[in-house]
Amino acid sequence: MPVITLPDGSQRAFDNPVSVLDVANDIGPGLAKATIAGKVNGELVDAVDMIDADAQLQIITAKDEEGLEILRHSCAHLLGHAIKQLWPNTKMAIGPVIDNGFYYDVDMEESLTQEDLAKLEKRMLELAKTNYNVVKNKVSWQEARDAFEARGESYKMEILDENISKDDRPALYQHEEYTDMCRGPHVPNMKFCHHFKLMKVAGAYWRGDSDNKMLQRIYGTAWADKKQLKSYLQRLEEAEKRDHRKIGKALNLFHWQEEAPGMVFWHNDGWSIYTELESFVRKKLREYGYDEVKGPLMMDRSLWEKSGHWDKYAENMFTTESEKREYAVKPMNCPGHVQIFNQGLKSYRDLPLRMAEFGCCHRNEPSGALHGLMRVRGFTQDDAHIFCTEEQILEEVSGCIKMVYETYAAFGFENIKVKLSTRPEKRVGADEIWDKSEAALAEALKANDIEFDYQPGEGAFYGPKIEFTLHDCLDRAWQCGTVQLDFSMPGRLGSTYVAEDGERKVPVMIHRAILGSLERFIGILTEEFAGFFPLWLAPQQVVVMNITDKQADYASDCVKKLQDLGFRAKSDLRNEKIGFKIREHTLKRIPYMLVVGDKEMEAGEVAVRSRRGDDLGKMGLEDFIAMAQQEVVEKTIK
């Protein structure tokens, strides 16, 4: 007689084993109608799965994050159902859930077009609207293999042969005549899968291996209701308008070339943003007591072997040879900083030692993964390493956390999610060191009243880390900042200090980045502001325009005064209509346009317009300067 305990603590007793759906029905018909799955003792199960012992149960609906993921996974199966009806010879590979949707890799002779996607989406909707039940069957390994062999599903057979034990009982999900294999859970009925859209088709190698066959990957998005789907598609449309690659081209900020994949060509205005951002971070470093250093771009293979990078990270490193020695271009700054620490005897009185670098790093990312400024091969990290004692960890990590939040606030980012990533399978260091590291980071977060989630297995190979993820105006997540403890690398590279008792000890090393990489952060800012950078960051801050040649000298004088005070200002003295000039500079998103005619020249004034189209009226040049200076100092976002 199972006793079911619900999230509110209430209990319900049953005379016989019950399914999740039975319990939902017992609570109320409305809940039963909305039930997608259940979570029994913390484990997700299908709505039809039976509970035969006392258990904790949470009913999962489309309002839950897990429910939305299940719904999306079932839409992937729905895609399989539809594609096999339209193209029966298609071989199905894998169809997992991804952020905001799903995909399915398929092997078929036809190259799918946008028209084919529309036809496939239409058939999916026709099938879903019949509201058929999804039937789950647990079968033996051999029964599953026989089922897929009869259908010629070679990829499913390979998954069974290589990834599933013959002692297991795989779950087969029946969508009318279509059968798929999955760990589940899935929706009990297709009434939950009416709100989806197929987005695009791309190529993908089977198992991500370029030696294998290229498949077609069909991407889709799915949501709980029509309103959510519409909202998501609108966000995508807005994201397309804000694409930093388009804005970068329109504003002449940067470009890329095939001759240097993943490397950025910075133009004058783009580099202005870069250097301003660097200066902002440099000022923060001084406030928080960091020394700024610069390490070499390449170092001998032997150092990377000692640090552990050669063993764990070699495939991502660019290498070269000279005079029979092998070198690696640095993918990270940490080993170089350890070398600087190791110069000269260090005492406990020298700790904490905070070392920062705008370090130029290179990583051999796959060409298919490169994406504008967001995923590059050459980038600059706002990297820092703090060498400290174990007793100083809490205070130092707390300082890093405070610095992260202050920096993000300057750009208007307030929605920040924090995760603590713990030990991965491939790692260096003993388990007791990892225990100590993970506990120290968790303690620092709790001490600063920071809510966080654990990410098991997602830490770097040398230590656990705190990850700070920004959410932008389109609610997209960008993981930028990290604070990472490392009890391993200093010891591996021979770092010691003289403790208070005269003994030699190995310092703790804290890896810290706030922006992550300057390139990627500029990409994020470009899309966040849609190119309307705040005044302090804008590459061109002010343009002064004359109406006729008569005011050219006055306009030039205004520009010189602005430039002398540090403003990035220029004049536009072309013999063009003022309306034409205003439109042109508005499109360039220059924050302020100052128009000078005879009246303004005689009164020593300027007529001020903003890039948003606001006419701010006439004011003395000194008054405008005071207003603009305040905006720069306060880092106002408009």
Curated annotation (Swiss-Prot):
Residues that bind Zn(2+): C334, H385, H511
Domain TGS positions: 1-61
Signal peptide location: none
Pfam families, sorted: HGTP_anticodon, TGS, tRNA-synt_2b, tRNA_SAD
Region (Catalytic): 243-534
Zinc-finger among keywords: no
Any GO MF annotation of the entry: tRNA binding
Cofactor annotation comment: Binds 1 zinc ion per subunit.
Cofactors required: Zn(2+)
Location of the protein in the cell: Cytoplasm
UniProt keyword Nucleotide-binding present: yes
Entry superkingdom: Bacteria
Keyword set, alphabetical order: Aminoacyl-tRNA synthetase, ATP-binding, Cytoplasm, Ligase, Metal-binding, Nucleotide-binding, Protein biosynthesis, RNA-binding, tRNA-binding, Zinc
Residues forming coiled coils: none
Reaction catalysed by this enzyme: tRNA(Thr) + L-threonine + ATP = L-threonyl-tRNA(Thr) + AMP + diphosphate + H(+)
InterPro entries in the record: aa-tRNA-synt_IIb (IPR002314), aa-tRNA-synth_II (IPR006195), aa-tRNA-synth_II/BPL/LPL (IPR045864), Anticodon-bd (IPR004154), Anticodon-bd_dom_sf (IPR036621), Beta-grasp_dom_sf (IPR012675), TGS (IPR004095), TGS-like (IPR012676)
Main location: cytoplasm
One GO term describing the cellular component: cytosol
Enzyme Commission code(s) on record: 6.1.1.3
GO BP terms: threonyl-tRNA aminoacylation
NCBIfam families referenced in this protein's UniProt entry, alphabetically: thrS (TIGR00418)
The protein's assembly and partners: Homodimer.
Family listed: Belongs to the class-II aminoacyl-tRNA synthetase family.
Function: Catalyzes the attachment of threonine to tRNA(Thr) in a two-step reaction: L-threonine is first activated by ATP to form Thr-AMP and then transferred to the acceptor end of tRNA(Thr). Also edits incorrectly charged L-seryl-tRNA(Thr).
Family matches, as HAMAP family: Thr_tRNA_synth
Protein name in UniProt: Threonine--tRNA ligase
Species for this entry: Alteromonas mediterranea (strain DSM 17117 / CIP 110805 / LMG 28347 / Deep ecotype)
Name of encoding gene: thrS
